[in-house]
């Protein structure tokens, strides 16, 4: 039901240069190079360039581990590839049940690290079912977000347990 809407929005974003076909294909269809990703232990997700700049200490500490870096924007993807050419950079599949489930079934991550306040309910619930540990790094909740999340107490509880 939502797929035509999602595809239409994607075309608008591509037309407005907010996405390209490569990024949108990875986000919507969980279309990745799973041969490389399957070998990785950690997924580190950041949304913006600022969040990417804040993960240097994490990447340095995990230097002997196989890491996949995931992002949300074209600019953070390009900078990620430039700063960490030896790591795999991808666009995170969007938080739809089928998308996340396909992606996580084809990977072998041990931990997912979410930078700042990236909270994706389907990602958290499905990764919990697959016994993946989720870690929120540098997370914070603004007063506005707290009010919004408190309206969904059951979901907030599930997320808080992660």
Each language-model region and where it sits:
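A hydrophobic membrane-anchoring feature enriched in long, contiguous, low-charge segments
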Residues: 1-12
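Active-site and donor-binding regions of nucleotide-sugar-utilizing enzymes
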Residues: 11-32, 38-162
